[in-house]
Amino acid sequence: MNNYLRKLVEGQHLTEEEMYKAGLLLLNENILESEIAAFLVLLKAKGETAEEIYGLVRALREKALPFSNHIQGAMDNCGTGGDGAQTFNISTTSAFVLAGADVKVAKHGNRAVSSKTGSADLLEELGVNISSTPNEIDYLLEHVGIAFLFAPVMHPALKRIMKIRKELNVPTIFNLIGPLTNPVNLETQFVGIYKRDMLLPVAQVLQKLGRKQALVVNGSGFLDEASLQGENHVVILKDNEIVETSIEPKKYGFSIVKNEEIRGGNSKENAKITLGVLSGEKSVYRDTVLFNAGLALFANGKAKTIEEGITLAAHSIDSGKALAKLNLLIAASNEKLERVN
């Protein structure tokens, strides 16, 4: 590890292979916590490259719990977090809207690191069993259409690193790679990131991971979600080609909503917001979810255009299908799934 730390101190980039090997060392129980913290801080200070991100993703996916089944059409809409905006759980709420539109959602997530309420905190508050095993997740994806993949369960080797990340309380490369380390072989993905200069590198990593289609967004105000505040910077991966563009919400009929207007709170407060959206209440929260879910449906290919995606998202909510998916997941995730273990 010392060789890699020296390179980072000197501001040098690591190659993909060096980062892969460094990643395996980070997961080794014999490494010192001070070495892990130093590596994460130095890497953040230098700035991460696509090669470094992919190298670490390789290491983490190699050490993750294995999945035996390929779920056709599975997607994730997990964001990086780390934007400091303290918004409500936009992507987690949107995940049920996607599921209600007949998209299989393998939602990768964790407890809060730099926010008040992470996806795991919200789902636990809503009554979802967040600790499903790979076999149970396969079952949930096949029969419910949505499953939650709790990062500490999927990546047991990350336990020490999670503790250090919490103590550091600053975004690290693990914020960036969280959405990229989903152990399910996804076909499509919608990723919100907090660092605008990482849009292209993250899209390049998704391409290397074999995604058929993907959309990476950095929202107005550097939100790690699509924002109704103004211009959103986007990179689209389709047919193995990467295109950079921008998206204005007003083009799709949305009123301007400042990011401060969609702040969330603790898990109870955010659960109330999520249930309100899924129950069809009209609000700035609903509009934000419609925009993000619409983009995700476009990224998935379920919708041919963003406009169609927004229409499908609204139907998912207003038909009751999105809320039904939440209730199904609560029930099924808490069953004793002995038949699949």
UniProtKB/Swiss-Prot annotation:
UniProt pathway annotation: Amino-acid biosynthesis; L-tryptophan biosynthesis; L-tryptophan from chorismate: step 2/5
Keywords tagged on the record: Amino-acid biosynthesis, Aromatic amino acid biosynthesis, Glycosyltransferase, Magnesium, Metal-binding, Transferase, Tryptophan biosynthesis
The keyword Repeat is assigned to this record: no
Recorded GO CC terms: cytosol
Amino-acid positions noted as binding 5-phospho-alpha-D-ribose 1-diphosphate in the UniProt annotation, renumbered to this chain: 79, 82-83, 87, 89-92, 107-115, 119
InterPro entries listed in its UniProt record: Anthranilate_Pribosyl_Tfrase (IPR005940), Glycosyl_Trfase_fam3 (IPR000312), Glycosyl_Trfase_fam3_N_dom (IPR017459), Glycosyl_Trfase_fam3_N_dom_sf (IPR036320), Nuc_phospho_transferase (IPR035902)
BP GO annotations: L-tryptophan biosynthetic process
Protein name from the UniProt record: Anthranilate phosphoribosyltransferase
Organism name: Bacillus cereus (strain ZK / E33L)
